[in-house]
Amino acid sequence: MSVADIKKGAEQKMQRSLDAFKNDLSKIRTGRAHTGLLDHIQVDYYGSPVPISQVANLTLVDARTIGVQPWEKKMVAVVEKAIRESDLGLNPASHGDVIRVPMPPLTEERRKELTKVVKSEGETAKVAVRNLRRDANEQLKKLVKDKEISEDDERRAGDDVQKLTDKFVAEIDKLVQTKEGEIMTV
């Protein structure tokens, strides 16, 4: 394994950690509506659970309302029940064959709770990135031990890995700050 492979592998893994963190953040509800909020909801479709996006069309009606239009009329009640029973605390209302899902405003207490969750998720993501840095540095040390590269090369590569780590940690911090801003905006 070469130094370039180690750096490239570390960067790819750090990017995956960042993507997973972004995905986790998208599931945290702010006061604003977005269709991604309902992505993880499973609907019972003829006896098997399927994602809501596979049985209905999701649209934004306005900044605080999601419109859900099941493709089959008989699925309206099932989809509405699945949304109501989700852990999001939403109260959907059906109007004919369209379900409107209004986003209730967040209470001050809930906002503070959510910012703590966001910070905690951010810390977890940063720890994952730092662990990847440690793994890359251990691989570099092994190359030195096996006399495949010099200590100077290891130091230079280690500095590059540190720069990557700093870049991803800064990106995570930025995402945390942005999400906190979204949550605290009334």
Swiss-Prot record:
Q: Which GO terms describe its molecular function?
A: ribosomal large subunit binding
Q: Which domain of life is it from?
A: Bacteria
Report TM segments: none
KW Protein biosynthesis (keyword) present: yes
List, in alphabetical order, the GO biological process terms annotated in this UniProt record: cytoplasmic translational termination
Q: Which UniProt keywords apply?
A: Cytoplasm, Protein biosynthesis
Keyword Lipid metabolism part of the UniProt annotation: no
Q: Name one GO cellular component term.
A: cytosol
Protein localization? Cytoplasm
Give the family from UniProt: Belongs to the RRF family.
Tell me the function of this protein.
Responsible for the release of ribosomes from messenger RNA at the termination of protein biosynthesis. May increase the efficiency of translation by recycling ribosomes from one round of translation to another.
Per its record, how is this protein called by name?
A: Ribosome-recycling factor
State the organism named in the record.
Paraburkholderia phymatum (strain DSM 17167 / CIP 108236 / LMG 21445 / STM815) (Burkholderia phymatum)
Gene from which this protein is expressed: frr
